[in-house]
A protein has these predicted regions:
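Cleaved targeting-peptide boundary
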Residues: 25-36
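Structured domain cores in non-transmembrane regions
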Residues: 64-129
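Glycine-rich, aromatic-bearing surface loops/beta-hairpins
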Residues: 144-196
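Short, solvent-exposed beta-strand/turn "edge" segments of beta-rich domains on protein surfaces
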Residues: 40-50, 61-71, 87-91, 148-151
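N-terminal secretory signal peptides that target proteins for export/translocation
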Residues: 1-6
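Bacterial N-terminal signal peptides
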Residues: 10-21
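A beta-strand/beta-hairpin structural motif
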Residues: 50-55, 106, 117-119, 127-150
């Protein structure tokens, strides 16, 4: 009799652990979908190199629901400029990060995006998540590098990587998501030789 009770308790405990594990596994896939730098190029304009890029971010119902529940997402675009060396590792000349945020505003029923480092604290709002992610994935004429930072007669490489991660949380979301790790993802590096 005691053996049956212990076996039953062990079975219940195993079922509970499996349910928790399945829940964690399903949450880890929350940022599933395409995350890539689709295209990018640099255009020199009066001694300033401007970046043009298109990034595809994942979109799914889990992201939409989390934003509507008060989660903020951070979108980072890492840019690395390195001097190519023939017989040694490339030398990093400059590193920059374009930081953007996305949140859902419940009163207006709109998605609000902003550039974190913008001096004007500009915000733009969008009716749908798809529109907001398309805008966040569009970088047009972002000045990131000055000509004097580059030496003449040297070859340089520009590399981009897009990332999505969990931002600020409401108190309710902090309690629910404190143990999840599925809210951070980065794309592969997208690289090309800099033409001057």
């Amino acid at each position: 009799m005691q053996f049956r009770r212990a076996h039953h308790l062990t079975s219940l405990l195993m079922a509970a652990l499996l349910a928790i594990g399945a829940s964690v596994a399903s949450r880890a896939d929350v940022l599933d979908g395409v995350l890539e730098v689709s295209s990018a190029y640099v255009k020199p304009e009066q001694g300033v190199f401007q970046l043009f890029a298109r990034i595809t971010y994942p979109v799914n119902d889990d992201i939409r629901a989390a934003l509507k529940d008060g989660l903020m997402l951070n979108f980072d675009l890492d840019v690395v400029v390195s001097r190519e060396r023939r017989f040694w590792m490339d030398e990093t000349v400059a590193e920059y990060t374009l930081k953007r945020e996305l949140l859902y505003h419940a009163v207006s029923d709109r998605y609000v995006a902003r550039d974190v480092d913008s001096p004007n604290n500009d915000q733009r709002s969008y009716a749908t998540l798809e529109e907001a992610l398309e805008a966040l994935g569009t970088v047009d004429a972002w000045p990131f590098l000055l000509s004097p930072q580059l030496s003449a007669n040297r070859q340089y490489r520009v590399s981009l990587r897009a990332g999505v991660r969990r931002g600020r949380l409401s108190d309710t979301m902090r309690v629910l998501l404190f143990w999840t790790e599925g809210w951070h993802r980065e794309s592969e590096w997208f690289s090309w030789s800099l033409q001057r």
